[in-house]
């Protein structure tokens, strides 16, 4: 099992969270227990993405296929679905995983066993210190809408990840927005409920704020909207 330790190394026990996570951050992570992760691909990537957020998971897989490299870091990998199905440029990519939830790290590591990924239990809202060489691609797929704060404050994640990128490296991902995008009434009700349950914190997340925060940090960037989801990439 994976233990979340302060050094971000692999150990043998399995607390759910890193000790230094804040209560607000912890709420968004602890919901991803083993039971939920067992139905995550069907419920989240299948039903919610298609029928509520109006962005089928194939669009997210296309983003991976376009931007992933053979030297990749995934922050908040969920179940590892996209890493399992995307096309890497080589048969033996270097893969590292960062998450604050040991369950997610364990499930993804097992799923990607053929790639021997290295796991680190870290909070992306804090400075990330890991003993590892920089990466050529970093994914933050479905992470931002689960983090506390607004796009303006939670974009500090990009500041923490930028030092982990090689020059010319790309950070990419997606996030579900509430402002500046079109949503159906069922989608809005679902989003409101997920915010009430503290699974999401995105009622103030705005499309223009995302574009602004990326542009302030990366000269070369792009944001594309499908449904109420923003798919983005930015180059260091």
What are these regions (language model features)?
Residues 147-160:
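A short, conserved alpha-helix within the catalytic core of class I
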Residues 165-171:
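Short glycine-dipeptide loop
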């Amino acid at each position: 099992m994976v233990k979340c330790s302060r050094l971000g190394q692999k150990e043998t026990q399995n607390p759910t969270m890193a000790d230094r996570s804040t209560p607000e951050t912890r709420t968004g992570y602890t919901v991803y227990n083993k039971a939920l992760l067992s139905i995550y691909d069907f419920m989240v990537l299948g039903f919610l993405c298609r029928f509520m957020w109006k962005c089928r998971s194939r669009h997210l897989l296309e983003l991976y296929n376009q931007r992933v490299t053979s030297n990749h870091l995934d922050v908040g990998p969920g179940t590892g679905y996209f890493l399992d199905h995307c096309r890497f440029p080589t048969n033996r990519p270097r893969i590292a995983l960062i998450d604050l939830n040991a369950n997610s790290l364990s499930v993804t590591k097992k799923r990607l066993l053929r790639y021997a990924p290295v796991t680190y239990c870290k909070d992306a809202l804090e400075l990330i210190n890991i003993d590892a060489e920089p990466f050529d691609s970093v994914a933050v797929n479905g992470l931002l809408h689960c983090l506390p704060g607004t796009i303006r404050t939670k974009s500090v994640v990009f500041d923490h990840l930028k030092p982990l990128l090689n020059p010319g490296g790309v950070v990419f991902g997606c996030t579900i927005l509430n402002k500046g995008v079109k949503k159906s009434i069922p989608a809005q009700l679902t989003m409101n409920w997920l915010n009430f349950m503290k699974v999401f914190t995105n009622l103030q997340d705005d499309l223009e704020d995302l574009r602004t925060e990326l542009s302030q940090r990366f000269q070369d960037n792009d944001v594309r909207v499908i449904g109420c989801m923003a798919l983005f990439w930015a180059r260091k």
